[in-house]
Amino acid sequence: MDKTQSSQGKCPVMHGANSAVASNNMDWWPKALNLDILHQHDKKTDPMDPKFNYREAFNSLDLAAVKRDLNALMTDSQDWWPADWGHYGGLMIRMAWHSAGTYRVADGRGGAGTGNQRFAPLNSWPDNANLDKARRLLWPIKKKYGNKLSWADLMILAGNVAYESMGLKTYGFAGGREDIWHPEKDIYWGSEKQWLAPTENPNSRYSGERDLENPLAAVMMGLIYVNPEGVDGKPDPLRTAQDVRVTFARMAMNDEETVALTAGGHTVGKCHGNGKAQDLGPEPEGEELEAQGLGWLNKKGPGTGANAVTSGLEGAWTTHPTQWDNGYFHLLLNYDWELKKSPAGASQWEPINIKEEDKVVSVGDPNRKFNPIMTDADMAMKMDPEYRKISEKFYQDPAYFSEVFARAWFKLTHRDLGPKSRYLGPEVPNEDLLWQDPIPSVDYRLDASEIVDLKAKLLASGLSVSELVATAWDSARTFRGSDFRGGANGARIRLAPQKDWQANEPERLQKVLKVLTELQASLSKKVSIADLIVLGGAAAIEKAAHEAGVKVTVPFIPGRGDATQEMTDVESFAVLEPLHDAYRNWQKKDYVVQPEEMMLDRTQLMGLTAHEMTVLVGGMRVLGTNYGGTRHGVFTDKVGVLTNDFFVNLTDMAYNWKPAGSNLYQIVERKTGAVKWTASRVDLVFGSNSILRAYAEMYAQDDAKEKFVHDFVAAWTKVMNADRFDLA
């Protein structure tokens, strides 16, 4: 053996590639377009059988039996993590709350719909400390019911049962959340490089007076909502009230729902800070192998029960923290409060001259009592004038408070599950709620011959290929796979606010809708405008493909309903407004983010892959669907014909590409210097990015003409049917 070698054996393989030690492509070229978000949940990571259907599995579940087991778990205290006052309800509610509470309306990402709390970064966020214990307590139930019950559904159901076990009549529960199998890559949690970074820190999520960066809702990296100690850890209830209002609004909650959720969430359970935070070990992702996925383990003792440390605040909000009552408002409104420090050194509010009967029995010793506590956010419910009015109303009418909370809790835990048609189980409420974006069911069928006849009428209506395709696209492109909102079903493109969105070219849109409405009225059979819009796009694509020499039938399944204005919450739908659309080569204005990055974000929300994005952009260009009829990226002399010309000319070395302005390029003939075409960044990225160029070259090949058409049709159909949950 070489004497210079260490006595420790060398690694038998080329190490580094499977760890964080190795540099990846984005480290070397940080400005490169990262396509990973389009391929994050493919079948390679999913261990389920190809034929596994979670909806069918859940529908075979004995939900009542699961709830009985959960009820039993609530009071079955385990020595390794004892229940506060013998009841796990507060812990389970916090777990469910923090699972759902990451949702934000701006992009629909986050939320409870995927079970993402099991993975980094959420499993190791400071605000999720000790929720790893809640999930381990649930493991015997998950193990028992197996694939019939996802982690995502179980976590929310556990929160629901916890409330019911403590006396709240909940509004209902729906299953249907399918688990993911590895961390999500598409969610932007902020650009800070440290947990709980204060406002003035580099890469702050705030600008101006206190403008929170879109699409974020939480005030700090690693928090679900607001800082419980106050803005940047400095107690000031009125400043905190501003943060609370912004955060909850970005979760689709109004002031009344905000007060109800704050009070209802703090009616039960407690904060944990009876110890020193520095005694805790790393979070789960930073722990050693022997910790087996647990984190925040106390290095100087058990650190459980009465001695647990989580947020650092210490105490319960109410006198009876294992029962649903109106005690939160009784204490908040009837006592004056003063700032104190918890044993862990956190700022919290405690009552002055509290009556003995209003104190809280100690978790560790039933013969001792302690003051209840309030966070800075709780004090905001008293100090902010609007929140105070609502708090007073809830205090005077406990039944009303319970009803508002139950509905708000249902909304919180189901907001990202999508429309009611996706709900599963026997406890789905009968009521249609406006935030569920209801759509009327249809009562007609169309056979193949009727569909052919309708296509002919649409093509003879006087509308062009580009008008039909663009309108169908605009109707469907609002779909978000994050929270299953938007899409062509409902034809809300006819209604406010969508009919007036700049992205939808209102003048052109009204022309098309007028023709379609007149056609609908002339039919002897009822057909929805939603179906006619989609069918018009299909007919136009078939015509364009035929003119390119390819015979193809675009799949079409009728069954879309037409929503009414009364079914449409204008404010709620405003967040779906497109501010950019690479597929139609448009953006409302220049943004800090590059157009191609915005294209990836929109593509991911629509559930498309990189090659589907590629073929759709190439097809939309030659079909002449650019916003306002611009010619950028229309690399063809046969506009309206579904050829692969976009890719043929993009990859042709007879041309040179030159910048000609902001997001504008000229395609110049190398020999003559003549300008042949113009293009935007989202056109040229398909020739610049090495991965996208590989797809572009494949579609530019001489043998790809038919494949291009068929791939375009497949991707198009995927977009048109993205919100057809009835077809699943």
Swiss-Prot record:
UniProt PTM comment: Formation of the three residue Trp-Tyr-Met cross-link is important for the catalase, but not the peroxidase activity of the enzyme.
Keywords, ordered alphabetically: Heme, Hydrogen peroxide, Iron, Metal-binding, Oxidoreductase, Peroxidase, Signal
Site (Transition state stabilizer): R94
Top-level taxon of origin: Bacteria
Cross-link Tryptophyl-tyrosyl-methioninium (Trp-Tyr) (with M-251) mapped to chain: W97-Y225
Cofactor(s) needed by this chain: heme b
Binding sites annotated in the UniProt record for heme b: H266
Catalytic center residues: H98 (proton acceptor)
Short name of one Pfam family: peroxidase
EC code(s) of this entry: 1.11.1.21
A GO CC term attached to the entry: cytosol
Disulfide linkage: none
Cofactor-binding details, from the entry: Binds 1 heme b (iron(II)-protoporphyrin IX) group per dimer.
Family matches, as InterPro entries: Catalase_peroxidase (IPR000763), Haem_peroxidase (IPR002016), Haem_peroxidase_sf (IPR010255), Peroxidases_AS (IPR019794)
Covalent cross-link Tryptophyl-tyrosyl-methioninium (Tyr-Met) (with W-97) as placed by the record, residue numbers: Y225-M251
Listed Gene3D superfamilies: 1.10.520.10, Peroxidase, domain 2
Record function comment: Bifunctional enzyme with both catalase and broad-spectrum peroxidase activity.
Similarity section: Belongs to the peroxidase family. Peroxidase/catalase subfamily.
Assembly mode: Homodimer or homotetramer.
Protein name as catalogued: Catalase-peroxidase 1
Biological classification of the source: Bacteria, Pseudomonadati, Pseudomonadota, Gammaproteobacteria, Alteromonadales
